[in-house]
Amino acid sequence: MKAILLGLSLFPLAVLAGEKIDKQIEVANGGTIYIENQRGDINIRGWDKSEFKVSGELDDKADGYELKTSGDKTQFIVNMPRNTDWGNSGDGSKLTIFMPKSSTLEFAGVNVSVTAKELQNSAEIDVVNGEISASNLAGNIKLTSVNGDVKAQNLSGNIAFETVNGEINDKNSSGKLRFSAVNGDIKSNSTASDVRLENVNGDIDFTLSSIKNLRINTVNGEAEVHIKELLKGADVRFESVSGDGEFYFAADVSAKFEIEAHANGKIINKVTSDKVSKAKYGPSSSLKFSINGGNANVEMNTISGRLELHTK
């Protein structure tokens, strides 16, 4: 009965601006934790307890908060006045939150930076202006910042990164990776076998271990891609507009290569002695060859860019 009462509890909504908070309630393991905080710095961490705990100081413009749980859903919202100025005036919330490792995290905010660690059952973090730092997360993971960097380490599962004006730095990820960025560089060191990227106005620096599927589409950016191993049947595709691509493959790479360059693009082949063919008409060139049995496929296409193939 006590657990049921706790499950339906709703903490008082009215608190003084900037007031300290220290609350803890029982929640369902494997449920969903929804957190909404519009401004400040939020530190979220998974633990082994079937409890949700929040401590720290609320935004000095906050109009109370809600903390409630029902069934497998828990909600913590820092309420803000409707006419809130989302600028930098005043202090945002400074909160540390603990939640079950087995629960799913959903976070939304505006001018807020978020750190999330040690969660095993998926996480979605969406902010407008702020940095996201994530480590040791697993499951379906989506990290989105419109104006801010995203830093990640030791993520596993189905992982998606999105930024508009910010950099993405991914270390030691595994599973499937998706990147979408505008006006920001992307760096990844990953064992993911399935990687896809779309970006505009940003450089790419990839170090990939074992690739089955790789798709890169870039506009106005430089790409440097190191692939330690192409798995049998692997499919690699690269397209660029006004952007260069340097690809480094293993010395014993087995693949069929089909490379095209248009509008004065250039192809440099340092994998084999095969020569680039110039088009009879127009400023285009192409290169086709197979090496070591051709167990994978590599297709590249550039408009006004430079493509370089290397082994190491």
Tell me the role of every PLM-derived stretch:
Residues 1-312:
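Intrinsically disordered, low-complexity terminal regions
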